[in-house]
Amino acid sequence: MDTAATPASDAVPTDTIGADAVRALIDHAILKPELSRTDVDAQLDEAAAYRVFSVCVRPGDVLHAVERLRGTGVGVGTVIGFPHGTTSTAAKVAESLQALADGAFELDMVQDIGAAKSGDWERVQRDVRAVVDAADDTVVKVILETAYMTDDEVVAASRAAVAGGAAFVKTSTGFAGGGATAEHIRLMRETVGPDTGVKASGGVRGLDTLLEMVQAGATRIGTSASARILDEVAHRSSTGAASAVGDDTSSY
């Protein structure tokens, strides 16, 4: 499985997007703290059935997810320092090493949000670099939590993430009261250039929103509404019309 960031110039054309292209964009999020093992298994099975690129699970679920998805072609990623980014760098490194030992193939780390809000970009960069170094060749995505950031901070945080070696910058955890916006995706894409991935997460609950994010420069999508989105692709492909189904406001 190719885990490299997709250059912006190779972003999926939104006027011709098909099911396979949508699948290749999706990290199916299974991150809510209240999910039982039965709930997690149902989501893992859904991800396998819809053949999405990967799942992003809670750290304690990595080993189980790897076993359950073995042979499906669906990768298993996880989150580090989630959702607040306030754990120490040493704790993030330890969490990363455990996740890798359990079989995670990508890591979505939360930046040190407090350091970012303090303008301590050297500290943010060091935090990212420590996880990137621990991850070795594993893809690391840095969650900025854009709901808390000014535009200037989004730019500075994106630069710090890239300087720290991140393969992707990512908008949101989905737990901060605000998710991805096209405006933030454009700003992040303009900042990091064509060779770093940009992941839109939080609030991407339908195909139209996914297409808007891709058009703005996203090369990966984090969502728990994968089934709804891919069902919408199939519906439009077969009928040429948008579905009447409303947005699922309960999704990540």
Predicted regions and their residues:
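Alpha/beta enzyme core
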Residues: P13-Y50, G60-V198, G206-R228, R236-T239, ...
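N-terminal acidic, proline/glycine-rich, low-complexity intrinsically disordered segments
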Residues: M1-A8
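Short, charged, intrinsically disordered terminal tails
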Residues: T239-A242, G246-D247
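Short hydrophobic "strand-cap" motifs at the C-terminus of beta-strands
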Residues: S201
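Short beta-strand scaffold positions
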Residues: C56-V57
